[in-house]
UniProtKB/Swiss-Prot annotation:
EC code: 3.1.26.5
Keyword presence, Cell division: no
UniProt protein name: Ribonuclease P protein component
Pfam family, one: Ribonuclease_P
Residues annotated as transmembrane: none
Stored HAMAP family: RNase_P (MF_00227)
PANTHER family, per database record: RIBONUCLEASE P PROTEIN COMPONENT
Annotated GO CC locations: ribonuclease P complex
GO biological process, one term: tRNA 5'-leader removal
Protein family membership: Belongs to the RnpA family.
Catalytic activity: Endonucleolytic cleavage of RNA, removing 5'-extranucleotides from tRNA precursor
Subunit description: Consists of a catalytic RNA component (M1 or rnpB) and a protein subunit.
Lineage: Bacteria, Pseudomonadati, Pseudomonadota, Gammaproteobacteria, Enterobacterales
Length: 119
């Protein structure tokens, strides 16, 4: 049985972890969301979220976006390559409803899977 937990090992926790991704990222972008990824040596994917107050003003909207990104990652972690991912959002993401945002995230993570298979 596949575990769908979201323990600390699956999260980017320190600035050092985030900087590792920002140095040489692979990008997958849409007008509202960008997912940066970089191969890691851990054998499992990890995720970090950066949602600036400048781009999404209201806290409940930022929390909704983070919740949806974490949930998509949690449910699909076993299909993702062993990479560190950072999810960045732009203005306009708050106008997307939950279904649209989930579709955008899915499309971007599938693109990262294809990029990882090529390299």
């Amino acid at each position: 049985m596949v575990k769908l937990a979201f323990p600390r090992e699956l999260r980017l926790l320190t600035p050092k972890h985030f900087n590792f991704v920002f140095q040489q990222p692979q990008r997958a972008s849409s007008p509202e969301v960008t997912i940066l990824g970089r191969q890691n040596e851990l054998g499992h994917p990890r995720i970090g979220l950066t949602i600036a107050k400048k781009n999404v003003k209201r806290a409940h909207e930022r929390n909704r976006i983070k919740r949806l990104a974490r949930e998509y990652f949690r449910l699909h972690q076993h299909q993702l390559p062993a990479m560190d991912f950072v999810v960045l959002v732009r203005k306009g993401v708050a106008e997307l409803d939950n279904h649209q945002l989930t579709e955008v995230l899915g499309k971007l993570w599938r693109r990262h899977c294809r990029l990882a298979q090529k390299s």
